Structure formats: structure tokens, C-alpha cells
Amino acid sequence: MGQKVNPTGFRLGIIRDWASRWYDDSPVISEKIKQDHVIRTYVLARLKKERAGIARIIIERTTKHVKINIYAARPGAVVGRKGEEINNLSQELSRITGKEVKIDVVEVVKPEIEAQLIGDNIAYQLENRVSFRRAMKQAIQQAMRSGAEGVRIRCGGRLGGAEIARSEQYKEGKIPLHTIRANVDYASVTAHTIAGTIGIKVWVYKGEVLVQRIDAIEEDELKRIKERRNDAGARNRDSRTKRRHRTKR
């Protein structure tokens, strides 16, 4: 199952948090979800030319304002000179949302082990006619040197302008997809080349996290199972004693 499911969704609520951190039970919740998608698409498209290296965008909502946390490899490209770029971006997003927008830019310390940035970098190289094998191998080497415990990259499409589409992948280290406590970063990116689109999938294993929390959850679950078994055993004993009394009568 771990080989098929999205690694990020598989770990949500355990070791990974949601990208939209707000709650609403009103009928307009679908409009807010759609608005989050529009915000992310707009921010990525606007900062693509600057090559800011956007790893992820976290959106938080309150009744009065919308807070957007942008994780970027080059935060200076997002902020701009004297903060002009970020001020213009917040004003444009305020017109989209109809609320006050607050933007915080967080620097990504190790962009070499961020799956989204690795995929974007490979896509950029493929669109500029760099060999896909060279781009994949260089990305894996840089990630392993930067502290990743395992990397896997797969490219699929008309690789090298071939007539027949195929997929190739390179892997180094280990990628434990079935282990929920394993911090596996995943990204899927599309490169638009002259020959057609090429799909890029990236898995980066960064080690295990929150072992104590998972052990506590497992202990609680074991206690519940034991309590259920004890309750079931007590009910069975009561039913057997009642049957014996009936037979004696």
C-alpha cells in the first residue's frame, strides 16, 4: 500500500501537518478551499520568474485576516527591494480574498533535500535541454551530501525526445514508504519540453520523527484492545454461568 499511496497524505495527522490550517463548518467551506487553491497558484505563477524556490505555502485563516507562510530558498526574491515585492503581493491577494492578507517568508535552510525544490530544479533543466540522466544524478548526489538518508527520482515521458514514451528512475539510500514514522518528503512536478510533457516524481527520506508520540499512540491502542478483551471475557463468563444455572434448574 505504501508504494501506491501519496506519502504526504499517508502521514497527515501523524508526522505531517496540513497545508491549510483552518476550520469552518459553514456552507461556504468549498469556496474557501477553492480560494486556497487560487492563492497558491497565483503566488507560484507570480514568483516563478524570480526563481525564488518555493518549497511550500501554508495558509491560516481567522475571521478578519488571512495569514500566508511562504517557505522559500531565496527569501530575498520574495521580499524584493525595501519590501516592495511582498507589499504588492499582499495587496493583490487582499483583492482576491477580500480580507487583510499577512505574508511571512521563511527561509528553507537546506533546499537540496526539499522534494519540491528538487523537482522544480530538474524540470527547469529539462526545459533548457539538459540531459535528464545528468539532472537526476546531480540532484541525488547533492541531496545525499546535504544529509538525506535516501533519494529516489523518477522521470516519465518522451525522455531525450524519443518517439516512444518511457520512464526511468535512479535511487540511492533507502526509502521506507510503509513506515509511517519515516519522514518521507514527496513532490510531483511537470516539465514542459518541446517533445511534450515529462512527469517528475521525487521521494526524499529525511529520517524518523516523533517516535515517542507514535509509541504512546500504540500503547493507548493496546490498552483499549485489552480492555475490550477483558469486557468481552467478562460477558462470556456471565453468559456461561447463567446457562449453568438454567441447566441445574
Swiss-Prot record:
Keyword rRNA-binding: yes
GO MF annotation list: mRNA binding; rRNA binding; structural constituent of ribosome
GO biological process, one term: translation
One Gene Ontology CC term in the entry: cytosolic small ribosomal subunit
Domain KH type-2 stretches: 39-109
Biased composition (Basic and acidic residues): 226-239
Function, in words: Binds the lower part of the 30S subunit head. Binds mRNA in the 70S ribosome, positioning it for translation.
Record's subunit section: Part of the 30S ribosomal subunit. Forms a tight complex with proteins S10 and S14.
Family: Belongs to the universal ribosomal protein uS3 family.
NCBIfam families cross-referenced by the UniProt entry: rpsC_bact
Name the UniProt record assigns to this protein: Small ribosomal subunit protein uS3
Biological source species: Pelodictyon phaeoclathratiforme (strain DSM 5477 / BU-1)
Lineage: Bacteria, Pseudomonadati, Chlorobiota, Chlorobiia, Chlorobiales
